[in-house]
Amino acid sequence: MARRLPVYLLLDTSGSMSGEPIEAVQNGLATLRSALNNEPQALETVHLSIITFNDRAQQDTPLTELSQFQIPQLRASGCTALGAALKLVAERAEVEVAKNTPEAKGDWKPMVFLMTDGEPTDDISEGLAAFKKRKWGVVVACAAGMSANESVLKSITESVVRLDTASSDEFKALFQWISQSVVSSSRSAGAGQELTSGDMLEPPPPEVTIL
């Protein structure tokens, strides 16, 4: 079986995301799917999963090959169960991502893109511990707007970016950047290169601030 490049998107769908922000994220997912579908190497290797979190975390889309990937309908309500989302992605990756065996290499280490606009409303310690036990290729956390807790995101990953106003244009730029980074990684994977976090991300656009 060909090695896959798993990509997990963890998306905040709490009540504060209602209206323009959740619509922008919905459109961003369409941008991502379109960009990846136009890239032969991505079509061959990339598998996408969507995990959303509000009062609880749920996997809306299990790890799915691009040709079968359907965008879930996002709805914003409730709180921000970030800890539950971290625990869930760790559990799902344990099940869905193929490990190395003596006979064959497993999947590439997953890429994780996390987006939140607020403060976690659950205790993230258990979920963070489970998340840290997993081997990830790259983990990017995005603070959407000034209300997101950047120090919490820094405890998850060193790669933290911010959208200053969380406008539709900024979300569009964010998803274009994610698309470019996934495409770049899929090309490296296709060339047989081992992927490291340093070379899996493209330089972000001006709308996406590195913290």
Regions found by a protein language model. Name each.
Residues 2-61, 68-108, 111-115, 138-152, 166-173, 177:
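Von Willebrand factor
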Residues 4-5, 130-137, 143-211:
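P/S/T/G-enriched low-complexity
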Residues 32-35, 127-135:
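Catalytic-core regions built around general acid/base machinery
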Residues 60-68:
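Short, flexible, mixed-charge acidic loops at enzyme active sites
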Residues 108-120, 125-128:
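Extended, charged alpha-helical interaction scaffolds
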